[in-house]
């Protein structure tokens, strides 16, 4: 399987060619030698096409989907997801916007303003957070507040709440939380608020949750049935055989892969991107383990509290029974 993608993308180099370049340049050699053997193999597999590139990792995603350079790509993906024509007006800064440590498991995060003024946040979590709805709601509210402050500052006395536009939160999961696996036939879950009477009140916040691991399984079993599924497979699947299936079914994706593998010819750049991803992965995994352990501790506390309450209730019941027994004894 090592050279399958080289048949599709002849610019891919051999393993020896990549190793020769690394050995010839001290900076590359120094970085390479800090990696574990498994990491070295993974890097070489990417550069040679033995496996595909993970498109969702921030560096590759932004190289391919950069809205300032190729806005039509992200526009098409968003249009298919939102089921409406989308045109990106500009990219918004999101530095420092993430609440608390919410960036700990993100591998990609971008905020764009659409032509109609609405805001779309597109993010991917490597491992899905616990409480995905609650977390998404908090960050969506933060984006809504940022928009309010920005628009109010621009409009001044002419400001109207009608000037505030929708905020879309589009969340991809590389490894989705367990609750999504209760719905194995669905790879998109759309949520928006509505009233119980049917009266239409615009509450501005909409959410899309996209478990890519489930999308991969569906497309592997049922085939790539439409353009949206083609985009999801492009994002989700780095297996050479699935990349071949995608390019055969939708030849327009060949150009995108060619751009990715052109990046891979720049060993220093890819090595820097790869090192950054490894650093983030290590930090993210530690944070995830801390979060999981804290959740377990919290759950145990609740169980202990419940046991304490049950013991207290039993003590009260025993005391009541002893009191009844004493009363009965007095009657004898």
Language-model features: where?
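Conserved beta-strand segments of the P-loop GTPase G domain that flank and frequently precede/overlap
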Residues: 171-173, 209-211, 234
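Short, solvent-exposed polar/charged micro-motifs at secondary-structure junctions
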Residues: 97-104, 219-221, 255-256
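Short, charged alpha-helical interaction segments and adjacent helix-coil junctions
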Residues: 2-51, 120-125, 233-332
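Extended serine/threonine-enriched, polar tracts that run as long, contiguous segments within proteins
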Residues: 196-229
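Short conserved micro-motifs at the rims of enzyme active sites and ligand-binding pockets
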Residues: 181-183, 219-223, 272-273
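Accessory alpha/beta interaction modules
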Residues: 1-206
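Short hinge/gating elements
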Residues: 57-65, 155, 213-218, 242-246, ...
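Charged, alpha-helix-enriched surfaces in structured cytosolic catalytic cores
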Residues: 69-73, 131, 226, 251, ...
């Amino acid at each position: 399987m090592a050279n399958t993608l080289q048949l599709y993308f002849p610019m891919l180099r051999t393993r020896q060619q990549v190793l020769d370049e690394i050995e010839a340049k001290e900076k590359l050699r120094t970085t390479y030698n800090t990696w574990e053997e498994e990491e070295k193999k993974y890097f070489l597999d990417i550069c040679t096409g033995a496996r595909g590139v993970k498109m969702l990792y921030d560096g590759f995603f932004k190289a391919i989907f950069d809205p300032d350079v190729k806005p039509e790509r992200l526009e098409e993906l968003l249009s298919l997801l939102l089921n409406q024509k989308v045109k990106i007006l500009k990219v918004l800064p999101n530095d420092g916007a993430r609440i608390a440590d919410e960036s700990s498991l993100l591998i990609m995060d971008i905020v764009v303003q659409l032509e109609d003024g609405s805001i779309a946040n597109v993010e991917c979590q490597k491992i899905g957070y616990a409480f995905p709805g609650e977390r998404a709601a908090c960050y969506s509210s933060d984006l809504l507040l940022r928009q309010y402050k920005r628009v109010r500052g621009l409009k001044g006395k002419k400001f109207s709440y009608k000037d505030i536009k929708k905020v879309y939160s589009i969340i991809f999961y590389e490894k989705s939380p367990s609750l999504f696996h209760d719905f194995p036939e669905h790879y998109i879950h759309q949520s928006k608020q509505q009233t119980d009477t049917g009266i239409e009140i615009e509450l501005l916040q909409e959410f899309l949750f996209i478990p890519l691991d489930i999308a991969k399984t569906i497309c592997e079993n049922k085939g790539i049935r439409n353009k949206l599924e083609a985009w999801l497979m492009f994002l989700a699947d780095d297996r050479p055989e699935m990349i071949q299936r995608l390019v055969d079914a939708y030849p327009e994706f060949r150009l995108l892969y060619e751009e990715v593998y052109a990046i891979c010819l720049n060993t220093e750049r890819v090595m820097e991107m790869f090192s950054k991803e490894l650093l983030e992965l290590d930090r993210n995994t530690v944070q995830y383990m801390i979060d999981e352990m804290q959740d377990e501790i919290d759950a145990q506390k609740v169980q202990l509290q419940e046991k304490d309450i049950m013991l207290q209730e039993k003590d009260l019941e025993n005391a009541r029974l002893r009191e009844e027994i004493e009363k009965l004894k007095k009657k004898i």
